[in-house]
């Protein structure tokens, strides 16, 4: 594991790239009680065209698919990942930006179990027709919430006016 010391911050960061390409970073915080874990992937709202692994042809997916998948990843075969984190005494969340989707947890107990749960649920997707319909309603409510936020509207209005042809204009 590579050890990187940042003199100005007085912090040591550990980094390892696994055989499967996953990059792992650890930042020990002496004197802190809470553990924070985050899994991030380079797939965000602007990623609407790409060549799938093992294929040669470019495909186009629906706008909003990254945000939709962010929500659906929490659906596990035997329940909901957020509920499983809660059983371990952890809080969990996720977010999608224009270039990334991230899943995270924070906890003061069961750190190893939380890391295992995080790595497990982000690697399996369980979608049913029923869960898709349910998610449509949840995402519609989120959109309405953002539409009521003046700061959000100004920001995305500016982005849409600056980037007429780029997918960053679509949240």
Regions found by a protein language model. Give the residues of each.
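Acidic surface patches and DE-rich sequence motifs
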Residues: 18
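Short beta-strand micro-motifs enriched in acidic
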Residues: 27-29, 95
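Histidine-acidic residue clusters that define the catalytic metal-binding segment
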Residues: 2-15, 159-171
């Amino acid at each position: 594991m590579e050890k990187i010391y940042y003199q100005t911050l007085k912090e040591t960061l550990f980094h390892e790239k696994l055989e499967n390409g996953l990059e792992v970073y650890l930042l020990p915080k002496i004197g802190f009680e809470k553990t924070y874990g985050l899994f991030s992937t380079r797939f965000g709202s602007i990623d609407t065209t790409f060549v799938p692994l093992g294929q040669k042809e470019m495909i186009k997916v629906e706008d909003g698919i990254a945000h939709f998948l962010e929500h659906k990843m929490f659906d596990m075969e035997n329940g909901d990942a957020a509920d499983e984190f809660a059983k371990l005494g952890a809080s969990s969340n996720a977010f999608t930006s224009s270039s990334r989707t991230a899943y995270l947890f924070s906890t003061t107990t069961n750190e190893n179990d939380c890391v295992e749960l995080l790595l497990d649920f982000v690697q399996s997707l369980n979608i049913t027709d029923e869960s898709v319909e349910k998610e449509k309603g949840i995402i519609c409510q989120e959109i309405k919430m953002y539409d009521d936020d003046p700061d959000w509207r100004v920001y995305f209005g500016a982005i849409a006016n600056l980037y007429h042809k780029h997918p960053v204009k679509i949240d």
